[in-house]
Amino acid sequence: MLVAGSLPAIAQTTEKTNDMDRIELCKENYTALFGGEALNGGGTDPEIMDILQKYIFGEVFRTGDLDIKTREMITCVCLATMQQLPQLKGHTGAALNVGVTPIELREAVYQCAPIIGFPKVLNAMTAVNEAFTERGIKVPLETQATVTEENRYEKGHEIQYPLYGDRMKEAMKDVPGGMGEKVARFLTEVHFGDFQTRSGLDTQTRELLTYCVLTVIGAEPQLHAHLRANLKAGNSKERVTAAVIQCMPYIGFPAALKALNIIKDFQPED
């Protein structure tokens, strides 16, 4: 699904992780991600670090069929959405350590822009670019744009329509002043034309990450629509469920449970 190179040998297969206790798995995943040692008793709050490390890296990381690269990209879009910039910088390094490319990570954060707004994405990219620079990665990265001024609507609509139909156009038709048509066009041009058409990540991955961003902000109507789109894009309900669970330690149980209930209760005709 992702544009990527080979992964390091880390604990991510179901067969292997099912045979490991959570402490062993936590230590292995943590070292692969951050290069240090988990559960070392250091710092000012070793107890909460012990709890969160075992929970995230020893339990959540073996829940569902997601590779470790996808898990780290999900973590990064959660942190970008919540504007937790120091943690985002740290997880940028972790993502690079497990094989996420700079282009993939940048595209994952860019994908948040139509949902959380451009200022937050610019803030997030400051943290990401700091991590890149410290690793000797030259910025700006290579362009991934694939559309022109002339075809951005057409190319965006080619992605949007099979996944969402004309629901947004219909929903906006009664906006005062006839401006709903403009809003629907903006969505097609910006979300799908300017972002979804970009190279670096495929539509299936972008839809999964988008669902995670919507989970963070609790956008219930959009969670319904984007679940349907995820299934059309090739993600299973089980995969989307695993992605939401990956968000859970960072966003808390209530927001994650809202998204999980939507997945659980979804019917194809919804």
Task: Give the positions of each predicted feature.
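Bacterial Sec-dependent N-terminal signal peptides
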Residues: 1-13
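Extended intrinsically disordered, low-complexity coil regions enriched in Ser, Thr, Gly, Ala
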Residues: 67, 83-106, 119-132, 218-242, ...
